[in-house]
Swiss-Prot record:
One of its GO terms (cellular component) is plasma membrane. Keywords: ATP-binding, Cytoplasm, DNA replication, DNA-binding, Lipid-binding, Nucleotide-binding. Residues 95-113 are annotated as: Domain II. The gene is dnaA. It comes from Pasteurella multocida (strain Pm70). This is Chromosomal replication initiator protein DnaA. Oligomerizes as a right-handed, spiral filament on DNA at oriC. It holds the Pfam family DnaA_N.
Length: 451
């Protein structure tokens, strides 16, 4: 039996969930709102232009095909627009601040937000690795409580900017509504507050406080793992805030479904809104971050030196800033100019560690394990797609993550010519723009190699 219009979109989602990765599904398709008010047309509302463009480019044809097949209507048209579905879903909460019951609507005292005023959108350096996260964070700050992005779940490795964005969202909300009750808290501090409340017999006050918030920002939610009592209480707080349209923003070092010993009901709720990854910054972004930080600290950092540091240190923003602070302090103490030679000497231990962590051999091993092939296959001559593509990817990663020259990389891949390596790098760069699955593989491998 063909689904009626009210259930067609849900049927589409169920089918599409089996066709694309869970990360892509949660990021791009799940937040869309479907409207059937126009005959023979499904209008999908995206929360911002960035999501609309991505859906148009990567998923619209697939969406249209599935919708036509499920509806039995070959003339059905699927469109994507930026905005909110005209008629709100009855089951969904309204946007902040139209919330609270009569008792909660009483005037609330101002609370301490624990936000860092230095972490704002204006000084967050944007690049390809964090572009989507930056866009959705801004959207949440502008329209807190919007159902399509509530909760907002940001995940990625240590030192990539999750906490900065978390504070930027909170500061953005407060800049638009100074009376908003916004709280930033680390997961460990939440647990400690709860322990204290139980000890002091003040759980009622604890619950009342958290349920009075307009926006709750919890950092490093993965620390709730194994803490059954904490998870139980947070479950009820989450439900109360979500059901009344208050904004929830969470960060973690991993995708919610990958957090072990966290209740399934919490994992499910964390995926109700928008889940977005922050990847390790690419070279251009690393250089931009260094130059921005140097400008903020009034440090003269020549661009070629920033480029040198960015090439050598590839892990995260925190390491880049630490390196800059060390270079600046040593230069000031010694009265020396900041040159490439000076940086090489000052950071020699950090650079040696980085070179030791990421080698061509290590990349080959990780890529081989990822694609379930042998390292010898990567060094061989097989032109089979199942071997050639991972080989090209491993070459491109070697160029990106190590300081080896093209001839040196080629030598490690069975004495391949440097032009073969160059072709592989260009091919992978091209395919990353065209095939989202390859871009996801690239990001997963970068993340693994950057640990």
């Amino acid at each position: 039996m063909k689904p009626d219009l009210s259930s067609l979109w849900q049927e589409c989602l169920l089918q599409l969930q089996d066709q694309i990765s869970l990360t892509d599904f949660s990021t791009w398709l799940r937040p869309l709102q479907a409207d059937f008010s126009v005959q023979n047309t499904i209008v999908l509302y995206a929360s911002n232009v960035f999501i609309k463009q991505k859906v148009d480019e990567s998923y619209l044809a697939q969406l249209t095909k599935v919708a036509q097949e499920l509806s039995g209507n070959a003339e059905l048209v699927v469109q994507v627009k930026v905005g909110v579905k005209p008629e709100p879903k009855p089951a969904q909460p309204s946007a902040l601040p139209t919330h609270h019951n009569k008792e909660e609507n009483k005037p609330q005292t101002v609370i301490r937000s624990y936000l860092n005023p230095k972490h704002v959108f204006e000084n967050f350096v944007e690049g390809k690795s964090n572009q989507l996260a930056r866009a959705v964070a801004q959207k949440v700050a502008d329209n807190p409580g919007e159902p399509s992005s509530n909760p907002l779940f940001l995940y990625g490795g240590t030192g990539l900017g999750k906490t900065h964005l978390l504070h930027a969202i909170g500061n953005g909300i407060l800049s638009r509504n100074t009376n908003a009750r916004v709280l930033y808290i680390h997961a460990n501090n939440f647990m400690q507050q709860m322990v204290n409340a139980v000890r002091d017999n003040k759980m009622d006050e604890f619950k009342k406080f958290y349920r009075s918030l307009d926006a709750l920002l919890v950092d490093d939610i993965q620390f709730f793992a194994e803490k059954e009592k904490t998870q139980e209480e947070f479950f009820h707080i989450f439900n109360n805030l979500f059901d009344t349209g208050r904004q929830i923003i969470l960060t973690s070092d991993r995708y919610p479904k990958e957090i072990e010993k966290l209740e399934e009901r919490l994992k499910s709720r964390f995926g109700w809104g928008l889940t977005t990854a922050i990847e390790p910054p690419e070279l251009e972004t690393r250089v931009a971050i260094l130059l921005k930080k140097a400008e903020e600290k009034n440090i003269y950092l020549p661009e070629e030196v920033a480029f040198f540091i960015g090439q050598k240190l590839r892990t995260n923003v925190r390491d880049l800033e630490g390196a800059l602070n060390r270079v600046s302090a040593n230069a000031e103490f010694m009265g020396a100019a900041i040159t490439i030679d000076f940086v090489r000497e000052t950071l020699k231990d950090m650079l040696a560690l980085q070179d030791k962590l990421v080698t061509v051999e290590n990349i080959q091993k990780v890529v081989a394990e990822y694609y379930r092939i042998k390292v010898s296959d990567l060094k061989g001559k097989s032109r089979s797609r199942s071997i050639a593509r991972p080989r090209q990817l491993a070459m491109a990663l070697s160029k990106e993550l190590t300081n080896r020259s093209l001839p040196e990389i080629g030598k490690n891949f069975g004495d391949k010519d440097h032009t073969t390596v160059l072709h592989a790098c260009r091919k992978i760069a091209e395919l990353r723009e065209q095939e989202h699955s390859l871009e996801e593989d690239w990001s997963n491998l970068i993340r693994t190699l950057s640990v």
